[in-house]
């Protein structure tokens, strides 16, 4: 093998590497004057030229060398074929040429398939999608796993390639296959924070309840990696599109998943909201839709369900397993309360700086949750009263409560402003006290920021409630 071989060819997906340090791929400038093959060249020289042409992506020279007798499935010291290398750099044009010349799309090296290599390639999703589509058109199996039991769809989900994921499923890829650690494609997408892929996988029938080997569901994996929006999506709400494409033919699925469907999803979300009552929406969201008829027969409303005691659950025929789901969902909806009663009298009189800062942080966090809740309600409420099909009481009752909320928010804003002024006064006195040792400026600045954020959050919450009030009055 030539001495100028490339070291460090792109490693196979999943972190698998070859024991050989010399893969046989040579990188360097290819002299264009040597590209025209005059007569027969020694086979080793042809191979070297072939490797150079592959490295720089010279399609015309690759074709010329293949015409001169180089095998399209020739392997080099690393063990990769030309097609595998072309797939690893997402060179769709080279992949097409090699496949047209008869390259084996199902080749694998140490459980590393060409399709896996393409799905984990470094390149644009457009080029990766083209490569994957070409390989699938030549009957590459989308369910063959690597040594770590990861399938192509897992690599595509991990790397954030939504269209590739959908295309693989359309060609028969199993959505709920698990790797050696129990990860599914959905788990990988949740771990990496790819919201669009999470939604697409749910639409394609992914099971969000499958656990990893250490007992974690995708929602918990998302939470552990601080992807809170995905955590909320997977842990509480049920995607209205879940499993929608499972029963379609391959042709219909390919047509649907490769077209823009934003308008369709908006229409679906709206119709889902208005077609069910609040009780049905809640039960469907926590996977208890089978209880709908039972609760309706007993005239149990959502408000009644959420305030039931344990004996009432049993009396109405709700099993302990279903009770746990309802209570868990209710717990998710509750805002954490600050227990002042747990503080000793001494701390109440002379609270420490850390405890006071913790109090402000909790207060700010709760205000943020309240603002988000009001924003979600404003977004979800239909603008036309004729489209409301839920069981609603008189809107006057809602307006009255909103007025009380606005008043309370205004009172809270006023009290926080008083608190801020008091703390500012204390801070000024401490700074002017010659006997006081100054704290680091950074700490002072941080505390000031917390106070400002708290005040702004409270004022913002009051403003949102005011808007909510106006909305109800208009309706």
Curated annotation (Swiss-Prot):
Listed name of the protein: Ankyrin repeat, SAM and basic leucine zipper domain-containing protein 1
Positions of modified residues (Phosphoserine): 17-18, 20
Taxonomic superkingdom: Eukaryota
Disulfide partners: none
PROSITE patterns named among the record's database cross-references: ANK_REP_REGION, ANK_REPEAT
Entry keyword Phosphoprotein: yes
Complex formation: Interacts with DDX4, PIWIL1, RANBP9 and TDRD1.
Cellular compartments annotated: Cytoplasm
Function: Plays a central role during spermatogenesis by repressing transposable elements and preventing their mobilization, which is essential for the germline integrity. Acts via the piRNA metabolic process, which mediates the repression of transposable elements during meiosis by forming complexes composed of piRNAs and Piwi proteins and governs the methylation and subsequent repression of transposons. Its association with pi-bodies suggests a participation in the primary piRNAs metabolic process.
One Pfam family here: SAM_2
GO terms classed as biological process: cell differentiation; male meiotic nuclear division; regulatory ncRNA-mediated gene silencing; spermatogenesis; transposable element silencing
Alphabetized InterPro entries for the sequence: Ankyrin_rpt, Ankyrin_rpt-contain_sf, Asz1_SAM, SAM, SAM/pointed_sf
Protein species of origin: Papio anubis
ANK repeats: from-to residues: 45-74, 78-107, 110-144, 148-177, 181-210, 214-243
Region Disordered, residue ranges: 1-25
One GO CC annotation: pi-body
Keyword Ion transport set for record: no
SAM domain boundaries: 272-334
Keywords: ANK repeat, Cytoplasm, Developmental protein, Differentiation, Meiosis, Phosphoprotein, Repeat, RNA-mediated gene silencing, Spermatogenesis
